[in-house]
Amino acid sequence: MNAFDTDITEHADSSGCHPLFRDVPATVEFNKLRKRLLRLTRQAIEDFAMVKPGDRWMVCLSGGKDSYGLLALLLDLKWRGLLPVELLAVNLDQGQPNFPKHILPDFLTRYGIEHRIEYQDTYSIVTDKLPETSTYCSLCSRLRRGNLYRIAREEGCSAIVLGHHREDILETFFMNLFHGGRLAAMPPKLLNDEGDLMVFRPLAYAAEDDLEKFANAMQFPIIPCDLCGSQDGLQRNAMKAMLIDIEKRMPGRKDTMIRALTNVRPSHLLDRKLFDFAGLMANGEKGSDDALW
């Protein structure tokens, strides 16, 4: 039996739980939610072979609901003996005005979580280089990525772990489809260009709604993102609205879309680099009529 098929409760530590979970709601609803998120996180880690025992993971913590949820779920799995890696929580303070600098250090220290807070004023760089009418996402992302790679190397980490969830992956897929002219989403596992760091997204199967409910129940001290979240008209917002509308009219379509991303048939697409159409010819062997119907 695959270890990921067993009941979460079978792996609880003898001391009960990680300190982060000692005051959680004792309700059936929360227990189901927690177990579902743990199961989906474990499944993604297993499906995409993220774990190498003894590795050190740098868990990126922004102060938003998704990164809090990611950190909590990984700590929960580690506490239960299901994640044999070291965890380091890292926050990159990018210098946004009115950013509450005390919240994350206080939270991490309170629960005894190993962490590093790094200050780099990328906010000023972005706002100086771009006009107010521009969207900051691309430049901000490049600056953030460079700093995170540097910190991971300084801390001896083998992987950078991000809190992107199911909806992030689907939104990226449709952004690439509608605006980039390519079929691509966010990979759950990626090797950086230099070849020395992995990037993992263990929440690839987790629903954003579940992560929001989880964050509310856990009472995480959420920090809003004023730098990018306040800008209107972003392509991602349009994709998010489209997916919400589709799910409202046809419940369950998001799960179907995620399954589709795991079930690609290159022979039924038009990319000649992925499938040898030139070498496909009648030779008496059976083919497939699926694409005709």
Swiss-Prot record:
InterPro entries: Rossmann-like_a/b/a_fold (IPR014729), TilS/TtcA_N (IPR011063), tRNA_Cyd_32_2_STrfase (IPR012089), tRNA_thiolation_TtcA_Ctu1 (IPR035107). Homodimer. Keywords: 4Fe-4S, ATP-binding, Cytoplasm, Iron, Iron-sulfur, Magnesium, Metal-binding, Nucleotide-binding, RNA-binding, Transferase, tRNA processing, tRNA-binding. Pathway: tRNA modification. Its main location: cytoplasm. The gene is ttcA. Pfam families: ATP_bind_3. This is tRNA-cytidine(32) 2-sulfurtransferase. It is an enzyme of class 2 (transferase). CDD domains: TtcA-like. A motif (PP-loop motif) lies at residues 62-67. It comes from Brucella suis (strain ATCC 23445 / NCTC 10510). GO terms for biological process: tRNA thio-modification. [4Fe-4S] cluster binds at residues 137, 140, 228. Catalyzes the ATP-dependent 2-thiolation of cytidine in position 32 of tRNA, to form 2-thiocytidine (s(2)C32). The sulfur atoms are provided by the cysteine/cysteine desulfurase (IscS) system.
